[in-house]
From Swiss-Prot:
Domain of life of the source: Bacteria
Pfam families named in the record: DUF1414
Organism of this sequence: Shewanella sediminis (strain HAW-EB3)
HAMAP family assigned: UPF0352
UniProt record similarity statement: Belongs to the UPF0352 family.
Protein name: UPF0352 protein Ssed_1809
Length: 71
């Protein structure tokens, strides 16, 4: 999603492959996959982002997601 990242493409792609493999293992349909990933994002925000910054981080994330699917 990000144009520039402090993480390598290899690192990102490796994690994506592992997460995808777990979802494949459970034969999760697309709607369940999206629900699980959304819940992971919500949990991550709740645990790792200070409460006063959560709304702004969630908004920034949602804008980046929307931009990434525009092509």
């Amino acid at each position: 999603m990000a144009i520039q990242s402090k993480y390598s493409n290899t690192q990102v792609e490796s994690i994506i492959a592992e997460v995808s493999a777990v979802l494949d293992k459970h034969q999760a349909p697309t709607d369940l996959r999206l629900m699980v990933l959304g819940n992971c994002v919500t949990d991550l925000l709740a645990r790792k982002v200070p409460q006063e910054a959560r709304a702004a981080v969630a908004e920034q994330f949602s804008k980046a997601l929307a931009q990434s699917v525009k092509g």
